[in-house]
Amino acid sequence: FPSPAISQENFRWKMVTTWPKNFPGLGTGAQRVADSITAMSDGRLTVKLYAAGELVPAFEAFDAVREGKAEMSHDASYYWVAKHKAFPFFCTVPGGLTVQEHNAWVYYGGGQELWDQLCGDFGLRAFLAGGSGIQMGGWFQKEILSADDIRGIKMRIPGFGAEVINRMGGTAVNLPGGEI
């Protein structure tokens, strides 16, 4: 049998993120993804990581990929709730699924198909590349004993959690994790 014709061309892709390069867990995870892609391709596809603010600001990562400024982004889909209300389902949700449950839903429960449909509307393709676990609640200067205690509180929380805090009378701030 003849050998298949395989292109010997090398590719260089840019990966933008919504966090600092060495941000524990998320930033280091993004670097691991970039390094793994480069290694699995024997260096034919080199992925250079750009931390939030290096190529584009954190909250411009989605549009940077759509506009061709970068080939990929490592981010948290709840940041894109203003683009479509369904994006937070593909990320951590306060009181939501565990990492194992979320992975099972995406890989075996139809989640990836829904995500493909959602991202296809934007000309993008998404896949899981790490996880931070269930979105934490908050750390507050005063004790929270009831739902009424949320009134007047200002906290950093994106996605569905932000909607809940706002409806309870608090003020949610959508801020990249690296800017806290």
Feature roles, as predicted:
Residues 1-12:
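Short, low-complexity disordered leader/linker segments with a strong preference
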Residues 12-14, 46:
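Mature N-terminal segment immediately following signal peptide/propeptide cleavage
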Residues 14-31, 52-56:
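Extracytoplasmic "Venus flytrap"
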Residues 18, 52, 160, 177-178:
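An acidic- and aromatic-residue-enriched active-site/binding cleft used to recognize and process polar
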Residues 31-35, 66, 71, 76-177:
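Contiguous mixed-secondary-structure segments that line small-molecule binding/active-site clefts
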Residues 47-51, 174:
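A structural preference for short, hydrophobic beta-strand core positions in alpha/beta folds
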Residues 58-62, 180:
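Short, hydrophobic alpha-helical packing/hinge segments within bilobed ligand-binding/sensory domains
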